[in-house]
Amino acid sequence: VYKRQSDYLYPDPDNMVIFLDNHDMSRCFYQLNHDFEYWKMAHAFLLTTRGIPQVYYGTEILMSDSTNPGDHGTLRADFIGGWDTDKLNAFEGKITGKRKEAQEYLKNLLNWRKNCKPIHEGKLRHFPPTFEDEIYVICRFIEDRLVLLVMNNDEDKKSVKPADYINQIKPSKNNHLGFDVIEKNEININEIIQIPSKSFLLMDLYY
């Protein structure tokens, strides 16, 4: 969170490459102790915050270096489905369980991001965690559209009113509806929303 306070050192922080892992460090899923909920939250942040996201191959099917942590050969293992001897084929989506869910999750998130102007052209404002709420919030916004990401890393669920953050950037209307990017439903930003432990809300809002 506080790394952003050094953004002034760079001519254009929005054009810096950001990543969760790469070929020289343990894979994200392993770093997160194979916690799928943390993995989803981490990628929601990566694909929403400022910068150009880099997603290492195999991330979308939860590849891990747990068998030999940090080993370069393990970090750069073949993507499953590229060889006749592979029992699964992620190239054709012939995978199951969490791997399939992760692939669909990332596909949905990336397709949404592709045409989301606030992510590509907008400003960023964040609300660092406090001892009272223990949640982290970022907003990406342009004149007529805003993206809100609320992350709850606490052990307890949190109650959040999206308008409390949105109105600090631009006043909203009564009964203003935002779109939940993950659940694909509408949310009244003036209502209290429960965010479970180790979970997040990603909302897309038009003015």
Where are the language model's segments positioned?
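Active-site neighborhood of glycoside hydrolase catalytic domains
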Residues: Q5-D7
